[in-house]
Amino acid sequence: MQTVVPDRLQGTDGIRRETKSAKDSECRGSTPLQIFLEKGWITEEFMELYVYCYVKNQKKSAAPKKRTIVIGWDPRDTSGNFTEAVVRGVRKAGGEAMVLGVVPTPLVPLFMLHNGADGGIMVTASHNPKDQNGIKLFLPFHGMKPLPSDDIDLTRNLLKQNFDAIKKLPLKGGRTDCQQKALALFQHFSLLPENSWIDSPDTLKALILVVDPAFGALTGIAAQIFKEAGVGKVLEVNAGKNGPVNLRSGVADLEGCPRITADMILKP
């Protein structure tokens, strides 16, 4: 039976699927696109192909020069196979990769606009479980998301590609680690008076605040910002590396932490 190819591979906000390694026996003999469409999986090779086409489209729509692309991700890909495939796809397309590493999604367009970059990529499946991953794209105009017509154009470009040829391409663009600069910008932006409802740091001195980042990208970041904002006591739960990201969507309750005890509150 012939595979039906939609006009747009994207859903409401980019692409998301259950992840599967391209080296898995169930993927052998199939192209990244076939695996995506027929089996409903996203492989690291599909991610490389997808962002390669995105960067090529960005280069096509502007004056010829090196495209600078900001790349961030959430912590669900502990192997780094998918995130590194994204960096590789950007560089093979001739893009200069500004790598932020694990950061919250809004920081990608924020850092992109702050630095005058030409595009942004966030590797995440948002609130979906840890066994899934995906890609959100940002455009240089005000950090906007692609319109449906942009998605269609990207899909058409992707359908023309031969991934075997892309695999053999050299890395044309460079790579710069920008995580510390990006996190400093995020904290500064979050604490700006015009972005806050806090009249004075003294306002929150008596507050005890529980922060649950659900083992996601805001682990360690949100809690620190609240401390800097003047919250008297900040308790962070469900934080750390390689945890169950977004267990039961990460918002229903404090998974794995049934109660906040007095000892937790009184601990220095």
Language-model features, listed with the residues they occupy:
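Gly/Ser/Thr-enriched, mixed-charge loops and adjacent short helices
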Residues: M1-V4, E18, D131-P268
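An N-terminal, well-structured beta->alpha segment
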Residues: M1-V86, K92-A93, R175-L209, A217
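Bulky hydrophobic/aromatic "packing anchor" residues in well-ordered structure
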Residues: D13-I15, V108, L154
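Helix N-cap and loop-to-helix transition residues
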Residues: T43, P104, L147-P148
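N-terminal small/polar loop signature for handling phosphorylated ligands or for N-terminal nucleophile
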Residues: K56, P64-Q132, Q224-P268
